[in-house]
């Protein structure tokens, strides 16, 4: 397994990390992802560790906290210092007026609750799940800085931020000498390349590493969805599609056909090629892969240990290109002084 620095930090993370969205299976939405129990989670974690994948990502809203609880039970008895635990909070976690957001009140409570569920006394990477415009950035970062100094958090990051959200936060950290975000858990895939327009250049400039979520385009790049064919019987898309990233059908089919062609050339599956393409992009520190079962996990792990050729990368780039929104389409006219990162 290859390990990379998480952004500009000294922490090294595996290029593939394991997501626990399938753990617990509470509620219609998360049960459509999976319902992995503790026994099965232990097996999946064993496979991960054998392959060198030692970072496990969760969130307080995954199955209403059950995903963190299952992860905590599944890692019991393992050397804690050999594991990297990543989790998130900010979204609503209860019915109370303060059970949401990035206020001091909510973040302190959310971190303590996560530590209890995970059965640990520190979190390696804690990320805000979204931007809270109702709480001053200074309050949020001062709270996270206190939690880092208290030893409850090792590193901090964000998820699903706009460019200005992240840049303002980094400026506040620098101005006040507060803990700095080193990671941005962002959506990025061959059928969703918007990350490249603003967030990737920011990550390069500011040393913020990407931890990629949904690298297979919300389950669309599994190799099971093809032009002119119905969705697989066990697809989660009928239940979850409205909550995920929009993907035009023609773009999806064009990308899948390119992935199949390249996959045939290198002897790899559609998802393995899609993941390997991501691993060659700037700023990407780790790609979060999930799995309902051992077979899915082993297939995803086959995305490392080899590389697409520059010609194959260019072919996938061409198949996945989309129309840029403003101001990014306008900036294409001044690439002489403002080049694209890829």
Regions inferred by a protein language model and the residue ranges of each:
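Glycine/proline-rich, positively charged
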Residues: 27, 33, 94-198
């Amino acid at each position: 397994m290859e390990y990379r620095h998480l952004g500009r930090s000294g922490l090294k993370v595996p290029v593939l990390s394991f997501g626990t969205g399938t753990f617990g299976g509470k509620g219609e939405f998360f049960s459509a992802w999976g319902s992995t129990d503790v026994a099965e989670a232990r097996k999946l974690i064993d496979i991960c560790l054998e392959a060198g994948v030692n970072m496990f990502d969760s969130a307080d809203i995954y199955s209403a906290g059950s995903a963190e609880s299952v992860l905590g039970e599944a890692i019991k008895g393992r050397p804690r210092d050999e594991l990297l635990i990543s989790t998130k909070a900010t979204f609503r976690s209860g019915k109370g007026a303060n059970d949401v957001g990035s206020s001091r009140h909510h973040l302190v409570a959310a971190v303590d609750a996560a530590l209890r569920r995970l059965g640990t006394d520190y979190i390696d990477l804690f990320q805000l799940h979204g931007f809270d415009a109702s709480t001053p950035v200074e309050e949020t970062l001062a709270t996270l800085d206190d939690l880092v100094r208290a030893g409850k958090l090792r590193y901090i990051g964000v998820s699903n931020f706009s460019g200005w959200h992240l840049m303002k936060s980094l400026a506040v950290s620098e101005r006040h000498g507060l803990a700095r975000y080193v990671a941005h858990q962002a959506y990025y895939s061959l059928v969703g390349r918007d990350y490249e327009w603003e967030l990737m250049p920011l990550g390069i400039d500011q040393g913020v590493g990407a931890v990629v979520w949904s690298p297979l385009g919300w389950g669309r790049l599994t190799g099971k969805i093809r032009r002119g064919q119905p969705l697989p019987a066990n697809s989660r898309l009928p239940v979850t599609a409205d909550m995920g990233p929009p993907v035009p059908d023609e773009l999806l089919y064009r990308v899948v056909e390119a992935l199949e062609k390249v996959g045939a050339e290198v002897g790899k599956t559609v998802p393995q090629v899609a993941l390997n393409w991501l691993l060659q992009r700037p700023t990407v520190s780790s790609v979060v892969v999930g799995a309902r079962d051992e077979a899915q996990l082993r297939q995803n792990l086959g995305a490392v240990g080899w590389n697409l050729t520059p010609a194959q990368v260019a072919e996938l780039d061409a198949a996945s290109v989309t129309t840029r929104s403003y101001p990014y389409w306008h900036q294409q006219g001044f690439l002489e002084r403002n080049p694209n990162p890829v």
